[in-house]
């Protein structure tokens, strides 16, 4: 039997399409899943006549800001009335649903409404957007129970960006569910025994939220949104993370990876995390990864296992974080160093040699070759010929595999347009210490030369 009441995963397009078709059935109990403010209070319907319903930012009411959606003014009683009416309608029309989400929109730049009343409530709760949101949710939850006493109805929300921090002096109603996002998070060290500040912060965040609610669903990020194709060795922490969730009585976990074609190790990550959520922390993740690789890569399996072990070992050796928005340069002297990337390339080449002529296995190995080529072509300290060869491999494989997204919000065309400047910038960053030393030496030389000339004149 599964250890989690709610299990979800989004790491491959196939997984996402299956959910849309009703096969994955991940959020079947949810009316909305996330970022739902405007599903209740639409700016198209209300902004022109009631701008006060929407977030204040920079002294103005806004429903969009910096390319993203704004938020709602949750201290406005009329906003509550509109949301309550719509929420009760949805509950009544969807008896098959248990969870009805009301959560902030996805815009880092708009941290809630900044009107005087909203700021006062958030400040009183310890400087968190939950100061306005949680009382709002609790009121909805009480109303839902009163109107539908014979139904199991929960009101859910996201603890995300400005609502991430647990509030002081407020507890949730028994039918409120908090979906806590693993931010800042770190996929290089486990939450069970955090080895750095990012993992420790999320570890402690769970403890603080447990004082507020006993219904937590963790939204866990298992991806580098900045570099969807770079090697991302995070399998080693997953069993301990699962144990941490179980020990803290987490009700559910949703693992989010890349939603686009070709995400790094996406198919294996989908399988391993799905199985882990079902079996629980007693599962031997390392053994399951090896079994998967042996079944999927055939005679090339020993080299593929060697590759995954090498990336994980080199990350551990570097003691670096494995973050959600890591730039490759943060690992140039770690697991993505020139020497390490060349070693990965050698391992993958040996894997191809093992299965030469087996087009199916070669096609599967192509994704690993693509990941290594991507890491290599962004290195600042390789020759032009080697870089061009890596870029040519990358270009061929993304075309063959139909890969169009490099970052969560940046496509292949944009990446290719920026690539020459990225390489130049990377080289300059790598050379900057040397350039600084040369400049200092030149300045010192000029100063000494001027002093000598002055002495001669005197």
Where are the regions that the model predicts?
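Substrate-binding cleft/loops of secretory-pathway carbohydrate-active enzymes
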Residues: 155-184, 229-237, 262-270
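C-terminal membrane-anchoring or membrane-association module
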Residues: 443-458
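Aromatic-lined carbohydrate-recognition surfaces of secreted/lumenal glycan-active proteins
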Residues: 135-165, 216-226, 253-256
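Structured mid-domain segments that build the active-site/substrate or prosthetic-cofactor binding neighborhood
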Residues: 75-81, 89, 197-302, 306
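Catalytic domains of carbohydrate-active enzymes that cleave complex glycans
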Residues: 276-429
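Conserved, mostly hydrophobic/aromatic
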Residues: 83, 102, 144, 178, ...
């Amino acid at each position: 039997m599964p250890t989690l009441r709610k299990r979800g995963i989004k790491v491959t397009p196939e997984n996402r399409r299956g959910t849309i078709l009703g096969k994955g059935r991940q959020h079947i109990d949810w009316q909305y899943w996330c970022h739902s403010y405007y599903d209740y209070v639409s700016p198209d319907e209300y902004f022109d006549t009631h701008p006060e319903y929407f977030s204040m930012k920079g002294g103005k009411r806004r429903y969009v800001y910096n390319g993203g959606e704004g938020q709602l003014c949750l201290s406005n009683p009329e906003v509550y009335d509109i949301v309550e009416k719509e929420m009760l309608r949805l509950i009544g029309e969807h008896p098959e649903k248990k969870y009805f989400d009301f959560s902030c929109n996805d815009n880092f730049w708009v941290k809630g409404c900044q009107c005087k009343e909203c700021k006062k409530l958030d400040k009183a709760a310890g400087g968190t957007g939950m100061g306005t949101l949680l009382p709002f949710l609790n009121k909805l939850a009480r109303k839902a129970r009163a109107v539908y006493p014979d139904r199991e109805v929960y009101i859910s929300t996201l603890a995300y960006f400005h609502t991430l921090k647990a509030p002081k002096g407020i507890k949730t109603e028994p039918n409120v569910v908090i979906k806590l996002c693993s931010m800042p998070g770190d996929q290089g060290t486990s939450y069970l025994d955090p080895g750095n500040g990012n993992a420790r912060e999320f570890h402690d965040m769970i403890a603080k939220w447990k004082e507020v609610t006993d219904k937590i669903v963790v939204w866990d990020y298992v991806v580098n949104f900045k570099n969807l194709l770079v090697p991302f060795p995070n399998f080693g922490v997953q069993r301990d993370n699962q144990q941490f969730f179980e020990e803290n009585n987490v009700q559910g976990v949703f693992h989010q990876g890349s939603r686009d074609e070709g995400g790094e190790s996406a198919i294996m990550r989908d399988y391993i995390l799905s199985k882990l959520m079902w079996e629980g922390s007693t599962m031997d993740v390392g053994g399951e990864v090896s079994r998967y690789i042996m079944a999927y890569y055939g005679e090339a399996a020993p080299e593929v296992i060697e590759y995954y072990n090498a990336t994980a070992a080199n990350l551990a050796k570097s003691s670096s974080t494995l973050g959600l928005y890591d730039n490759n340069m943060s690992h140039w002297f770690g697991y993505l160093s020139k020497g390490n990337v060349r070693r990965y390339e050698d391992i993958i080449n040996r894997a191809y040699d093992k299965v030469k002529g087996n087009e199916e296995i070669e096609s599967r190995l192509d994704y690993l070759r693509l990941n290594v080529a991507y890491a290599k072509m962004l290195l600042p300290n390789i020759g032009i010929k080697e870089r061009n060869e890596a870029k040519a491999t990358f270009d061929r494989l993304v075309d063959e595999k139909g890969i169009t997204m490099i970052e969560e919000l940046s496509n292949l065309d944009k990446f290719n347009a920026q690539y020459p400047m990225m390489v130049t910038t990377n080289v300059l960053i790598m050379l900057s210490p040397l350039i600084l030393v040369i400049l200092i030496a030149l300045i010192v030389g000029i100063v000494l030369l001027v002093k000598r000339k002055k002495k001669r004149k005197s």
